[in-house]
Amino acid sequence: MPSCGACTCGAAAVRLITSSLASAQRGISGGRIHMSVLGRLGTFETQILQRAPLRSFTETPAYFASKDGISKDGSGDGNKKSASEGSSKKSGSGNSGKGGNQLRCPKCGDLCTHVETFVSSTRFVKCEKCHHFFVVLSEADSKKSIIKEPESAAEAVKLAFQQKPPPPPKKIYNYLDKYVVGQSFAKKVLSVAVYNHYKRIYNNIPANLRQQAEVEKQTSLTPRELEIRRREDEYRFTKLLQIAGISPHGNALGASMQQQVNQQIPQEKRGGEVLDSSHDDIKLEKSNILLLGPTGSGKTLLAQTLAKCLDVPFAICDCTTLTQAGYVGEDIESVIAKLLQDANYNVEKAQQGIVFLDEVDKIGSVPGIHQLRDVGGEGVQQGLLKLLEGTIVNVPEKNSRKLRGETVQVDTTNILFVASGAFNGLDRIISRRKNEKYLGFGTPSNLGKGRRAAAAADLANRSGESNTHQDIEEKDRLLRHVEARDLIEFGMIPEFVGRLPVVVPLHSLDEKTLVQILTEPRNAVIPQYQALFSMDKCELNVTEDALKAIARLALERKTGARGLRSIMEKLLLEPMFEVPNSDIVCVEVDKEVVEGKKEPGYIRAPTKESSEEEYDSGVEEEGWPRQADAANS
């Protein structure tokens, strides 16, 4: 058999061994390696390579090099080399060469170079001398690594419960009482609903995470495969922590990640074990709310005020712009898109939010039109069914062009929905159901079905002469007896009404409540106009009798608290026109001014000061046209 010493096999083997030895000397090898070396024909020789230094990943404070050998923070080190020496010694190390500050290795003092990656700005640096890798951390990153941050929404809720418990219902009620006058029953319902929403999140989120982990792990895996998966996850997290320079057992972040790995292991019972078990975890379900009441009673204001004091995302959506899928208008998914936007596009945080559906009565179906599709009424209600109950909604991503695939999946199971609407004419439907006398009419009328017929009957009743206080009391009494079948007759489909189990009727505002709205709450109407006049160095005084007269006018208009601002704008139009750039220092409004019997009273400054102001203002006004003419000429 001919010898192969002179053939190319020997040369290839020599090159392979040489490259292996060079790699081992550079530090790629992780321990003792047995390698077979080709020798004489038919024999093998084994050489044992010595242990090569490991490439370690640590997190240590690195110092900036300067010309005089002093670090950036002022602590000098004579043993460390200067920037010029390091650059002259390793000219091909890959430094930028722009003359800026360079990072030194905290182990040997040699200059560190940035690791070349596909990212233009990398935070990893390496030392060519001691083969150490480092992560450059900013001050903000260092602070974040010390403080334990929650790894998921469930841990964030648990941490919030431990550090600061959720506000009790009484505290939420007192906060709403500062901005909204009256409606005590609605405030109590909303306060309790928000508090229970916090508790439901705390109770349900861990169970959902376990179910999601079980789906991802596949329940058909054997215990051996589960153990292998668990070790793989631990290995991944350990390597990740080593790259970041954090020990998996010596740091709070490492402990939390290790705990997260253990939590992701499915621990729920499977198959026959579920049938044999007598104990099961309680899952709290949500109770969506429906607020109904006359216009201007404070439904939207309650939602806006409630959004300020919550630690969960809150979105207010207008149902009047919603249409069925495929038609011009906003899609139903835009409701969740607004919530996701309020959560800064954090999906887990958005899945714990609260959605307020305003003007929900405007999507009531219109009966009698069987040939046409009610795309803005019953079609929207049908699209909201699964949204209210809990489903996966595909929401377009941030800054996406609504192309295929650019969506985010949001689970609405734990999102609380609060709907509100005026439901004009609902009291007449309740009266007909109860066969009671309604505002002087003897026999029940043949009123048509649907929200349009009810609203038309209510509008016809408003145009007639009647006692305002009697109307308010009768409507409030009837709305307290509202039932699901009344809402169905109004135009809401039974499936939609059934998903709003808590129905809260709001009472109309009386004269006393309207007077309180003018003055008492924060951001009241009268203080707003006083602030406007104070910018012109003028005071606004409104007497108590004038406040009562304004409240009576608002009651007659039957527009609720919104009528107050309309009346105030009409009363103060002339004063707001006369006060700027004048000598008026006070405006007085009394009962006769509200009734239209006289003009508002003005209190002016002394005559001498006013004449000087008029003279100065006249010169300025005449001077501007003269200067403009001179410039044009």
From Swiss-Prot:
Tissue: Higher expression in skeletal muscle and heart and to a lesser extent in liver, brain, placenta, lung, kidney and pancreas.
Sites bearing N6-acetyllysine, chain numbering: 437
Stored SMART domains: AAA (SM00382), ClpB_D2-small (SM01086)
Outcome of swapping residue 298 to D: In EPP2; results in decreased ATP hydrolysis; cells with the mutant protein show increased ALA levels and accumulation of the heme biosynthesis intermediate protoporphyrin IX
Top-level taxonomic group: Eukaryota
PROSITE patterns: CLPX_ZB (PS51902)
Places the protein is found: Mitochondrion; Mitochondrion matrix, Mitochondrion nucleoid
Compositionally biased region (Acidic residues): 611-622
Recorded catalytic activity of this chain's protein: ATP + H2O = ADP + phosphate + H(+)
Sorted UniProt keywords: Acetylation, ATP-binding, Chaperone, Disease variant, Hydrolase, Metal-binding, Mitochondrion, Mitochondrion nucleoid, Nucleotide-binding, Phosphoprotein, Transit peptide, Zinc
Segment annotated as transit peptide: 1-56
Residues with PTM Phosphoserine: 617
Keyword Acetylation appears in the UniProt entry: yes
GO BP annotations, alphabetical order: ATP metabolic process; proteolysis; proteolysis involved in protein catabolic process
Basic and acidic residues bias: start-end ranges: 69-83, 598-610
Gene3D superfamilies recorded: 1.10.8.60, P-loop containing nucleotide triphosphate hydrolases (3.40.50.300)
Similarity comment text for this entry: Belongs to the ClpX chaperone family.
Complex formation: Homohexamer that forms a ring structure; this hexamerization requires ATP binding. Component of the ClpXP complex formed by the assembly of two CLPP heptameric rings with two CLPX hexameric rings, giving rise to a symmetrical structure with two central CLPP rings flanked by a CLPX ring at either end of the complex. Interacts with TFAM.
Name this protein carries in UniProt: ATP-dependent clpX-like chaperone, mitochondrial
